Regions:
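Short, flexible, solvent-exposed loop/turn segments with mixed acidic/basic and small polar residues
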Residues: 54-61, 100-103, 117
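Metal-dependent nucleotidyltransferase catalytic core
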Residues: 20-39, 71-109
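Catalytic cores of NTP-dependent nucleotidyl/adenyl transfer enzymes across multiple folds
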Residues: 2, 116-169
């Protein structure tokens, strides 16, 4: 698994406005799981399932968004993307290993992220790490509050924190 570290100038594109961090909300998780069930019904013909991902899945404070990760096999990559493009009527962002779709539900920003290759390996590895290391998960949550004064600083800290963990695995 290749760990990616952005150059310092990459973060200059982010604003210096604060990142609103909200405490974990169990009602939001229940609603997100319902959304995920509906998404998985739509995905059923592809044989791919969306997994709730990120802070909400870990029951941590976060930005209040709902994130879903999908890991299609190579032969299911394009059928999955085709289905999602038709459903969401477009793509938010795309590169070789990550395609992101945006939606909104019940006042929450929703990200549906399709991953493959090293990006998928990194995503799975960090979630597994946090599930197994409660102390690191608590440190991650505390760091969100320490670095939320600026979106630029928040993402610089978060990306490097995750890269440090992945390099240690």
């Amino acid at each position: 698994m290749r760990v990616v570290r952005e150059q310092p100038e990459y973060y200059e594109m982010f604003s210096t406005r604060p990142v609103p961090i909200r405490p974990f909300d169990p009602d939001s998780k229940r609603a997100a799981l319902d959304y995920g069930a509906r998404l998985n019904e739509r995905l059923a013909p592809t044989g791919v399932a969306a997994e709730l991902h990120g802070s909400l899945a870990l029951e941590l404070a976060g930005k209040g968004e709902w994130e879903y990760s999908l890991y299609p096999s190579p032969d299911r990559w394009y059928p999955t993307l085709t289905l999602l493009v038709n459903h969401f009527r477009g793509v938010y962002s795309m590169d070789e290993e990550v395609v992101m779709f945006n939606d909104a539900c019940a006042g929450h920003h929703v990200e549906v992220i399709v991953l493959r290759g090293d990006a998928a390996a990194r995503n799975r590895a960090i979630m597994q790490y946090w599930r197994e290391h409660l102390d690191a998960r608590a440190d991650y949550e505390a760091g969100k509050y320490r670095h939320c004064h600026s979106k630029r600083d928040y993402y610089r800290w978060k990306d490097n924190y995750i890269a440090d963990i992945l390099e240690s695995l």
